[in-house]
Amino acid sequence: MKINGSSLKTFPSSFINIARKEKYIILLQNDTKTFKMNKRNLTFWQMWNLSFGFFGVQIAYALQSANISRIFATLGADPHQLSFFWILPPLMGMIVQPLIGKWSDRTWCRMGRRKPYLLVGAIVAVLVMLFLPNAGSLSFSSRLLLGLNGAMWFGLFSLIFLDTSINVAMQPFKMMVGDMVNEEQKGQAYSIQSFLCNAGSFVGYLFPIFFTWIGIANTAPEGVVPDSVKWSFYIGALILILCVLYTFVKVKEMDPKEYAEFHGIDLQKQEEKKGEGILSLLAHAPKAFWTVGLVQFFCWSAFLYMWTYTNGSIASTVWGTTDAASEGYQAAGNWVGVLFAVQAVGSMLWALLIPKFRSHRSAYVVSLVLGALGFISVFFIHDQYALFVSFLLIGAAWAAMLALPFTILTNSLSGEHMGEYLGLFNCTICLPQIVAAAIGGVVLKLVGGAQVSMMVVAGVLLLCGAAAVFAVKEKKD
């Protein structure tokens, strides 16, 4: 045990007992009344267990990302409408994630602090994943309401519930790392989370082409989602609940007293601050919250366009079709899963190199520039295998986006309001997607109507994000 500036007699006996038991390092601040415990380093497997459930959640998210445009195009959506369907996921995230952060900051029960939300979100996500791909198979009226048929309306409401539940299940993993990992290990912990995220993406993206390969039908009657996609969602739902249950059982969260001592929080002052509202939190947010948020705006706008238009882009440039009912379009849909899996591999490999950079900022810039080159190159490539290079480069940007923003932000925060700040920070993920989705149809017309042109737009947005990184400072403000 290491003592800075004082003897053990300075500290309360209960504090010393916990310190001895848990092998904390005690750091004395300006006076003997203010102290902080930095918890001993976690083992690799403890950090792995913290994030393992994220693997299953990310499979669900990957299935949603790779197949939503395909599903709604199959149900009859016009290409210029596709970006509007993508407003729903980030909109729900912007509403749900700050609430989960706020509520879980105030939740202390036998099951834990963040874990109850994780479990509820996973259960709801599993149920919705069983229904969403069946939207076209159920007997709905073909009568249009606001230009959408019954199947599309069912799909829309299913998408709302799916994304809400995924957000509820996803957010606690980020918070638990912030809660339970010391500053020295947070970069490693978020890198493990990034690895599991990309591994889950890899599996989820490949599911449709795998099920097609083993003989499950990849085509279906007009307006019906193919069985290969349905089975992808079914198996993804099973893996999701198993992975979340693993983390739920393996991880034990801190109790309120231990958490306060770990983060150096004065419980009395925290009680006085409990009524602090969102505006007050934003007013006292560290500078990194805003500067990294600006980078996030450009990055997530770019990836929203990738998720929305990749299917239509390669169906046109590689398979030469824009007919959503055609075999070529469905083959392109499967290949999108392969390309996104390649992106996940690129992310996993690049994540190993990110710690080698001298600073987070330089890693951030290089990663986003490589991703921009990958996006722009899609416009010029007409061979399905050559696109592997493009998506490996895109994977570099994705690796940085998953790990670096949260590392920089959580290192700038104290333990107080950790969940609320992370929930609010996720608005920097959701808001740009809403804006990009809302204007996507207009931008598509401005660039000539070819969906592949939106990949160039995505590349330009990433270059803007790389430029914005230079405003980021890594310190507690």
Task: For every predicted segment, state its role.
Residues 418-446:
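A late C-terminal transmembrane helix in Major Facilitator Superfamily
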